Amino acid sequence: MKLKTILAAALLAVGLSVNAQTIIKFSHVVAADTPKGKASVFFAQKAAELTKGKVKVEVYANSALYKDKEEMEALQIGSVQMLAPSLAKFGPLGVKEFEAFDLPFIFDDTADLHKVTQGPVGASLMAKLEPRGIKGLAYWDNGFKSFSANTPLKAVADYK
């Protein structure tokens, strides 16, 4: 059900013509065999299936079209219609609150993360993108950050 809602929102965002096929360019910067890469291909397949071919999602993995720092501008000018960026990429657009997701120790686990992203806070953050010409469709899990050091990292102060 959630996938159908996301797909419907994507179709509205790009404007579906009655007879013409709509092409959605979906750019991301990770390899095709990663969870995000596989999910983007799955999305493309479901879009074609659920729209009976009226929507074709072209997936461009591994920075094939744009590098990480170029993707957001490409989205804003319409060169691509979908991205799956790191949430921190929305900070330079003036929505600095998204940068909080990159802080260590902010969530205890994935369930804790989902309480925020799938609740009122997540919806409020998504709404802040719309005045910038971006319609957020969903939060994708991208795994927690991993750090390594020569000494144990147990508190924020240990990262200095």
What feature does the model see in each segment?
Residues A44-Q45, Q76, Q81, S86-K160:
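Contiguous mixed-secondary-structure segments that line small-molecule binding/active-site clefts
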Residues Y60-E73, K154:
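Short helix-initiation/N-cap motifs at beta->coil->alpha
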Residues K25-F42, N62-K67:
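Extracytoplasmic "Venus flytrap"
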Residues D33-E58, P120:
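Short, polar/charged alpha-helical segment
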Residues T5-V14:
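Sec-dependent N-terminal signal peptides
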Residues V14-A20:
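Sec/Tat signal peptide C-region and signal peptidase I cleavage site
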Residues M1-K2:
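N-terminal secretory signal peptides that target proteins for export/translocation
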Residues S17, K54, S79:
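Conserved functional loop/turn residues at catalytic and ligand-binding sites
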